[in-house]
Amino acid sequence: TSTSENKAIQAFDFTAMDKDGKTVKLSDFKGKKVYINMWASWCGPCMREIPELEKTYQKLKNNKDVVFLSMTSPNDSEFKNQSPQDKGKDVILNKAKELGVTYPVLFDVNDRFIINYAIRSFPTHIFINSDGTIGNRIAGGVTEELLTKEIEKLK
């Protein structure tokens, strides 16, 4: 018998906001494989990997079993982040647009994502299995090849 199943860590059910101010929760995607890229508009390695992320998203966007998200930590008061890691929402969205990002950009609220996923560096990649457990996490930049491989490994 495998003990890895017993050690599976349940992913924290975060609540974030999308660009239109709508609430987005991890539990909205129950039963799906979820990939989340934590990034910041000032982060060089984040900017360099975004074209790789976008290529991966284009390959996967029609796959109904996979959810591709990005998370940021804006300093606007509406998000109530006590220790925001980025500038305001408009700066973040402009940077995303400039870099050709078409996947969803979410905004952390009350630092819940950063705290509960123990984000210490940017970028950080979180991979969540369809049963809601953490599949993997990678700190640092990724390539399209690595990202695709990690998403394919999710159960």
What are these regions (language model features)?
Residues 1-13, 155:
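N-terminal targeting signals for export/organelle localization
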Residues 13-34, 57-59:
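A short beta-strand-turn-helix
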Residues 32-34, 39-42, 75, 121:
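Short pre-active-site segment immediately N-terminal to redox-active cysteine/selenocysteine motifs
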Residues 38-55:
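Conserved redox-active cysteine motifs that mediate thiol-disulfide chemistry
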Residues 75-87:
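Short, flexible/disordered intra-domain loops and linkers
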Residues 84-128:
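Short, internal strand/loop/helix patches
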Residues 121-155:
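Thiol-/selenol-based redox modules, centered on thioredoxin-like
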